[in-house]
Amino acid sequence: MLSPKRVKFRKQQRGRMRGVATRGNTIAFGEFALQAQECGWITSRQIEASRRAMTRYVKRGGKIWIRIFPDKPVTMRAAETRMGSGKGNPEFWVAVIKPGRILFEMGGEEITPEIAKEAMRLAQYKLPVKTKFIALGDEEKTAGAKTPAASKAVTVES
């Protein structure tokens, strides 16, 4: 599973998720992508489950790029622990997702739009946020749109 090798601080505050993604919101490597429609946290386990689902479907046909990385530690206290006595220990890692963020990309000579769409649909079921499938041509047309929800891309909502 994905996690940072080393971090400056072991624990982080939860923070707020406001606005839309300003970075990582365009297709950079492949021809097809899965774009987030709402904000949320995606754990390293969910990223791995999505990756496995896509990889199993496309087999050796193409290449998959993971465009998010879980770099935020989530701490938890032991069950039935009284209040106080500090913050809990880091239990797992999450990636903070904002609307418009590209989560996964897919490309290759053997990857058709139908194969990519089905593989991304399988990955959508593993994720806790609403997403949509976009292709390289669709994404360029919607670059001027203010929000990802306003885009005219091919949508497959989960």
Swiss-Prot record:
For the keyword Ribonucleoprotein, the answer is yes
> Which of UniProt's keywords are assigned here?
Ribonucleoprotein, Ribosomal protein, RNA-binding, rRNA-binding, tRNA-binding
Determine if Ribonucleoprotein is one of this entry's keywords: yes
User: Which GO terms of the cellular component aspect does the record hold?
Assistant: ribonucleoprotein complex; ribosome
| UniProt-recorded Gene Ontology molecular function terms | rRNA binding; structural constituent of ribosome; tRNA binding
Family listed: Belongs to the universal ribosomal protein uL16 family.
What is the protein name given in its UniProt record?
A: Large ribosomal subunit protein uL16
Which species expresses this protein natively? Synechococcus sp. (strain CC9902)
What's the encoding gene here?
rplP
